[in-house]
Regions:
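Short helix-capping/linker segments at secondary-structure and domain boundaries
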Residues: 101-105, 139-146, 247-255, 284
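A generic secondary-structure signal for well-formed alpha-helical elements
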Residues: 64, 71, 99-102, 142, ...
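Internal, conserved structured core segments that host functional sites
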Residues: 108-112, 116-165, 169, 187-190
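N-terminal Rossmann-like or analogous alpha/beta NTP/dinucleotide-binding catalytic cores
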Residues: 2-135, 288
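Conserved nucleotide- and phosphate/pyrophosphate-binding catalytic cores
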Residues: 153, 159-326
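Short, polar/flexible loop-turn hinges at active-site or ligand-entry regions and domain interfaces
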Residues: 52-53, 145-148, 173
Length: 326
């Protein structure tokens, strides 16, 4: 029996943070042996919000290094840049004929991005990036797509496009299902709902222990816990949300200590620093190896792109045949 196929992707914005790990990478790593996986470096998608392409290649390499250091296995799953597989653009063009402007304007994720990034004039590419995302997924006939709740509307658009193409031209594409990430996101160090490089509120997977300590020292905690012995409210404390992920075996002790006033914020942050640093340490070690062996990283990318290209060519020819385009 053939394994179901998964298409996962990230926009390359440089080095990854622990929010990327919790929200995506951890899930990808756990799925790589169970499914047939393809991992996409979505470099075209970067251009939807930033036209400056000077750093895209280097950011792609940095992200790939983090993928490898965190535990993705290139022997199992190809890793490749979207821009190097020309079939992405061709399928995107075809799919753009199947998606209406009204449907894209109703997409809540795009609405949120426009609001959060204060975008006044939305580009055609930004409005239509769920169509490009549909091409990314369906070019490899993805059955499942690991996403957070905020990306589910995009998967629904992908399903609609697959259905419309199949009805119009004949059966080619599956209708992919979202595979929700259990621990979808970590809040930023400033208390913002999302950890984001653009907001400067991250702990990187490449941060050393001292850097993590410095960053966590400034992290937002319960404003009512002014003195060490004041009882705290873990449910409103940012640091406690990190403990839930990185200190699972101590979580009851930490919660009890906070509520009773026995555990002060400084000690709580130091404990969190220690546990996050211990988690990151093996990733840092592997990252150092790949930084010193960049030719190996580039070879992994080339191999992944060659493997992805073979699959993409087969799919696009099938599409052309169904559409009688030759």
């Amino acid at each position: 029996m053939n394994k179901k196929r998964i298409l996962s992707g990230m926009r390359p914005t440089g080095k990854l943070h622990i929010g990327h790990y919790v929200g995506a990478l951890e899930n990808w790593i756990s799925l790589q042996h169970e499914y047939d996986n393809f991992h996409l470096i979505a470099d075209y998608h970067v251009l939807t919000t930033n036209l400056n392409s000077d750093s895209i290649y280097q950011d792609s390499i940095e992200m790939l290094i983090d993928w490898l250091a965190a535990g993705l296995d290139p022997k199992i799953s190809p890793m490749f840049r979207q821009s190097q597989i020309k079939e992405h653009a061709e399928l995107h063009l075809i799919f753009s004929m199947l998606a209406t402007v009204n449907r894209l304007e109703r997409n809540p994720t795009v609405k949120d991005q426009i609001r959060d990034l204060h975008i006044e004039n939305v580009s055609y590419g930004h409005l239509g990036y769920p169509v490009l995302q549909a091409a990314d997924i369906l070019l490899y006939k993805g059955d499942l797509v690991p996403v957070g709740e905020d990306q589910v509307p995009h998967i629904e658009i992908t399903r609609e496009i697959a259905r419309k193409f199949n009805n119009q031209y004949g059966e080619v594409f599956p209708e992919p299902e979202p595979k929700l990430t259990a621990f979808a996101r970590l809040p930023g160090l400033d208390g913002d709902a999302k950890m984001s490089k653009s907001l400067g509120n991250t702990i990187l997977l490449s941060d050393d222990a001292e850097t993590i300590k410095t960053k966590l020292r400034k992290a937002v905690t319960d404003p009512l816990k002014v003195r060490k012995n004041d009882p705290g409210r873990p449910e409103v404390c940012l640091v406690f949300s990190y403990h839930k992920k990185f200190s699972p075996s101590e979580i009851l002790e930490i919660e009890t200590g906070c509520r009773s006033g026995a555990l002060g914020c400084v000690d709580c942050k130091l404990k969190c620093t220690s546990n996050i640093s211990s988690f990151i340490a093996p990733i840092l070690e592997k990252r150092k190896y790949y930084e010193e062996h960049l030719d190996e990283v580039k070879d992994i990318l080339t191999d992944g792109e060659n493997r992805a290209q073979k699959v993409a060519k087969i799919t696009i020819q099938e599409v052309r045949d169904k559409m009688r385009l030759g």
